[in-house]
Amino acid sequence: MTDNTYQPAKVWTWDKSAGGAFANINRPVSGPTHEKTLPVGKHPLQLYSLGTPNGQKVTIMLEELLALGVTGAEYDAWLIRIGDGDQFSSGFVEVNPNSKIPALRDHTHNPPIRVFESGSILLYLAEKFGYFLPQDLAKRTETMNWLFWLQGAAPFLGGGFGHFYHYAPVKIEYAINRFTMEAKRLLDVLDKQLAQHKFVAGDEYTIADMAIWPWFGNVVLGGVYDAAEFLDAGSYKHVQRWAKEVGERPAVKRGRIVNRTNGPLNEQLHERHDASDFETNTEDKRQG
């Protein structure tokens, strides 16, 4: 189907009302829109995030570290409501000039170290604590291969397929077909890799799995975009096997609900400041 009713202007101008439900999450310029400092809790690591796939990567990693007894990985997870423009506060922009979640401050250093971009945070935590990134050069490189594969693939799955299939106010056949093809190609790449290995980068659970699961694991398990049937997710049997196994890890079950503001109330922990919050402060408890 061809729709030629839209003709781009010679010079694009921003229509603030055109973004619909997403009008407040982005702008064509950078920098803060308002003055507001970020809160700081009691733990060494201060995370400012939202429970999207990119946010889940980091909270899963932190919960995995804590599960190993790494006390230095204790963290406060502060909710950044991107629909309300929290990411454009002066405090947040100071941590991440790109105004995207997640963003991390490590207060074990003076001055604190800022870390932004989810892949960078995973790598920082892996190197800081010495877990989930192999020391062997070949294994480390393979892990990095897949971490960067995800960083390149996620925009096609999320901003491309997820947006036009699930969120866009108008269903555009060309856009959906284009990004569905790429989503399925990426799933096939991952499926073939997992046919040969228990985890994405080999036989070890690494930051590659933590990066990829919130995107591709959630998609095939029906956790995002309501697209599992449309994508014929059941046909990717190796991705299904891996997604279910990783999803059963206790740290993944915890990490995936931190800073989450949608879905079942018992799977929403808006902020995490203590391990006990998983038992006492999920939204079903708070609203019950």
UniProtKB/Swiss-Prot annotation:
InterPro entries: Glutathione-S-Trfase_C-like, Glutathione-S-Trfase_C_sf, Glutathione_S-Trfase, Glutathione_S-Trfase_N, Thioredoxin-like_sf. Residues 139-265 form the GST C-terminal domain. One of its GO terms (cellular component) is cytoplasm. Coiled coil: none annotated. It comes from the Bacteria. Glutathione 1 binds at T52, P53, N54, Q87, I101, E117, S118, Q151. It holds the Pfam family GST_C_2. Its EC number is 1.8.4.-, 1.11.1.-. Residues 268-288 have a biased composition (Basic and acidic residues). PROSITE patterns: GST_CTER, GST_NTER. Glutathione 2 binds at N26, R178. Residues 260-288 are annotated as: Disordered. GO terms for molecular function: disulfide oxidoreductase activity; glutathione transferase activity; peroxidase activity; protein homodimerization activity. Keywords: Oxidoreductase, Peroxidase. SUPFAM superfamilies: GST C-terminal domain-like (SSF47616), Thioredoxin-like (SSF52833). Belongs to the GST superfamily. Nu-class GSH transferase family. Binds two molecules of GSH in each active site; there is one tight and one weak binding site for GSH. Exhibits a robust glutathione (GSH)-dependent disulfide-bond reductase activity toward the model substrate, 2-hydroxyethyl disulfide; the actual physiological substrates are not known. Also displays a modest GSH-dependent peroxidase activity toward several organic hydroperoxides, such as cumene hydroperoxide and linoleic acid 13(S)-hydroperoxide, but does not reduce H(2)O(2) or tert-butyl hydroperoxide at appreciable rates. This is Disulfide-bond oxidoreductase YghU. It comes from Escherichia coli (strain K12).
